[in-house]
Amino acid sequence: MKDLTERQRKVLLFIEEFIEKNGYPPSVREIARRFRITPRGALLHLIALEKKGYIERKNGKPRALRVSKSIRNKIPLIGEIRAGEKREAVEYLEDYIEIPESFLSSGYDHFLLKVKGESMIEEHICDGDLVLVRRQDWAQNGDIVVAMVDGEVTLKKFYQRGDTVELRPANREMSSMFFKAEKVKILGKVVGVFRKL
């Protein structure tokens, strides 16, 4: 999965969803229209996906393609997050990991982060775990969130009172962090935890 660019991944997902909804694959023009690119650009993406083994095409026939390797439930692992102090936000694609569909919220993007640190151990989120994050820009009190403050990200429980946000660890040995609400950007809500035994 590392061999797909982000745009190729999105094109492949679009093809899969289009087939599921309509019963047949999209045309090159429909792909181009969806991504606001030229038909030639769409064709180049299809050629790349075919070379990488994700689709099969029959040359010269419209809509003659099929998906040979699905990525529907493959979620991007985009790096690490500290469950402790804040850390500079660096997003880089490490891999794609297949996640059961029942873990995914319909209509939302998801991503995975590898946890570093012990600030969330009382919520059973440990060093080395993978957290499944539903991408959203809001949170309710008590949600476990990925939050960004001054360009740095952290994994904490979210509480807001008035214009003050508390990012609270789930470890009694650590202290909460308090910020003005406008300084805190929610990147997503944790909806699952995966651990190797």
Curated annotation (Swiss-Prot):
Xref: InterPro entries: LexA, LexA-like, LexA/Signal_pep-like_sf, LexA_DNA-bd_dom, LexA_repressor, Peptidase_S24_LexA, Peptidase_S24_S26A/B/C, WH-like_DNA-bd_sf
Alphabetical list of Pfam families matching this protein: LexA_DNA_bind, Peptidase_S24
Enzyme's top EC category: hydrolase
Residue ranges for the DNA-binding region feature of this UniProt entry: 28-47
Annotated site (Cleavage): 83-84
GO biological process: DNA repair; DNA replication; negative regulation of DNA-templated transcription; proteolysis; SOS response
Catalyzed chemical reaction(s): Hydrolysis of Ala-|-Gly bond in repressor LexA
EC number: 3.4.21.88
GO molecular function annotations of the record: DNA binding; serine-type endopeptidase activity
Keyword field: Autocatalytic cleavage, DNA damage, DNA repair, DNA replication, DNA-binding, Hydrolase, Repressor, SOS response, Transcription, Transcription regulation
Top-rank lineage group of the source organism: Bacteria
Active site: residue positions: 119, 156
NCBIfam families, per database record: lexA (TIGR00498)
Function of the molecule: Represses a number of genes involved in the response to DNA damage (SOS response), including recA and lexA. In the presence of single-stranded DNA, RecA interacts with LexA causing an autocatalytic cleavage which disrupts the DNA-binding part of LexA, leading to derepression of the SOS regulon and eventually DNA repair.
PANTHER family named among the record's database cross-references: LEXA REPRESSOR (PTHR33516), LEXA REPRESSOR-RELATED (PTHR33516:SF2)
Similarity comment: family membership: Belongs to the peptidase S24 family.
Quaternary structure annotation from Swiss-Prot or TrEMBL: Homodimer.
Full protein name: LexA repressor
Source species of the chain: Thermotoga petrophila (strain ATCC BAA-488 / DSM 13995 / JCM 10881 / RKU-1)
Gene name of the encoded protein: lexA
